[in-house]
Amino acid sequence: MKVAPSLLSADFMHLAKEIESVSNADFLHVDVMDGHYVPNLTMGPVVLENVTQMSQVPLDVHLMVENASFFAELFAPLKPQIISIHAENEKHPHRVLQLIKNLGITPGIVLNPHTHEESIKYLLESVGLVLLMSVNPGFGGQKFLDLVLEKCLKVKELIKRYNPSCLLEVDGGVNDKNIFELQQAGVDVVVSGSYIFKSKDRKLAIEGLQNVRQSLA
């Protein structure tokens, strides 16, 4: 299992130390919120540029914004590995996904908990990652919604049919109590914020999620 600690849960007063404490992660998950699509504001490109100078861990950028094309171009110079947009918020998602791909970045598509998985069927060939929200977006520290496990199974079947190389990622309320179920549901990447950043040993917490089979053996 690949693990992406969510910087939304980090202490920004000590950002360098926080990032070093999760340096064994597979990705750093960055939530970009504009205060319009979701009722919260987070980091911009200046903060994220500092992050790239502190860490070699690839960036996984999740855009929760009204104008995804603008923000994709704004963050592209920082060379994130992934930029994901919300299916619910784009009139022309293919166009935005192609823009992200043309910028040399893996495009991803995001589904909120209430959005039907069939809505992304015709987008799957255009993305390298599907991100399923297992909480309602906008704030960290929320409880995992169990209904998303069934959705994972359905999305994984769509991925197998339309784009087998596409990764399945889940974000929200992920911890050591539900990681095995997520693995069984076909999830490839988990985003975890509060669980990791509240752990006494963050690197050990990450390893526990990464090595889910061994930790449960």
Swiss-Prot record:
SUPFAM superfamilies: Ribulose-phoshate binding barrel (SSF51366). Its cofactor is a divalent metal cation. Keywords: Carbohydrate metabolism, Isomerase, Metal-binding. Catalyzes the reversible epimerization of D-ribulose 5-phosphate to D-xylulose 5-phosphate. Substrate binds at residues 6, 62, 138-141, 171-173, 193-194. It comes from Helicobacter pylori (strain ATCC 700392 / 26695). The gene is rpe. It comes from the Bacteria. GO terms for cellular component: cytosol. CDD domains: RPE. The keyword Secreted does not apply. A divalent metal cation binds at residues 29, 31, 62, 171. HAMAP family: RPE. This is Ribulose-phosphate 3-epimerase. One of its GO terms (biological process) is pentose-phosphate shunt, non-oxidative branch. Binds 1 divalent metal cation per subunit. Its EC number is 5.1.3.1. Belongs to the ribulose-phosphate 3-epimerase family. GO terms for molecular function: D-ribulose-phosphate 3-epimerase activity; metal ion binding. InterPro entries: Aldolase_TIM, Ribul_P_3_epim, Ribul_P_3_epim-like, RibuloseP-bd_barrel.
